Amino acid sequence: MTARTVGDRVGALLGADEDTVQLLGYGVYVGEEVPGASAGGTFARLCRVQKMVNPKLQLDNGDVVWGCECWWGREESVRAHVQRLVGKGRRLVEVRIADARKAAER
């Protein structure tokens, strides 16, 4: 996502493989901040250590997801991408970021 404005609608994907598309959800871009302690992954930790900001996304389901934890973009683009993948036979799976973070710790 290139130009972004606080309040822009966004979509966030955890990932996709040959069988599934893992959707974190849709929400809004809330700005650039240093990821909080709950953000998972090596890049999130690096951002905290180096005090580097990262895109913060507030999803409609209440979850806060950081750009470094997912693939994200404008809502209409993500919806179109998901539709293309599902149209090719992939199964759509909704994932909560807390569950993904726990699974990544294992």
Could you say what each language-model-derived stretch is?
Residues S38-V49:
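Non-transmembrane, membrane-adjacent beta-strand/coil modules in membrane-associated proteins
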Residues C47-R106:
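Intrinsically disordered, low-complexity, charged/polar segments
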Residues D19-A39:
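Short beta-strand-centered aromatic/proline hotspots
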Residues R4-V6:
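Short, well-ordered loop/turn sites that connect or cap secondary structure elements
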